Amino acid sequence: MDKTAKKILIVEDDQFLRDFYQELLTAEGYQIDVAPDGDIALEKLSQGGWDLVLLDIMLPKKDGLQILQDIKTTPPKSAIGPIVVLTNLGHDTVINKAFVLGAGGYLVKSALNPDEVLKEVKSFLQKS
């Protein structure tokens, strides 16, 4: 594995989407890890060192907004890059709350295609 590859954490409970993101981003040379629920996500996030986090809002155990709040309250051991919220909820209130809690951006899952995902990931990584 390339030690210079950017590290991305995918927090998504839907197995199909998790596999989709993982395969797509691994093929581009990114180092990927996954978390299927909020508790596992917080455990992995607490270690820090992520260049980018793709965080679903609707998760079992702890939702994405709770995770953002926990990170804000108790920062990770080392820095993490932007947190991009993944949601089917295009509601302004949910998105605004995510930004208030520290999200760096959002993607509406229903509008995504592979090229768009790669474009957005590259854009967020360049900003970090």
Predicted feature locations:
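Acidic, metal-coordinating helix/loop segments flanking the phosphotransfer/catalytic sites
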Residues: 34-52
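Acidic catalytic/metal-coordinating carboxylates
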Residues: 37, 63-69
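Two-component/phosphorelay signaling modules centered on CheY-like receiver
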Residues: 15-33
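Active-site residues of response regulator receiver
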Residues: 56, 87
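The feature encodes the CheY-like receiver
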Residues: 60, 91
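Conserved acidic carboxylate
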Residues: 12
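As written
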Residues: 64, 99-105
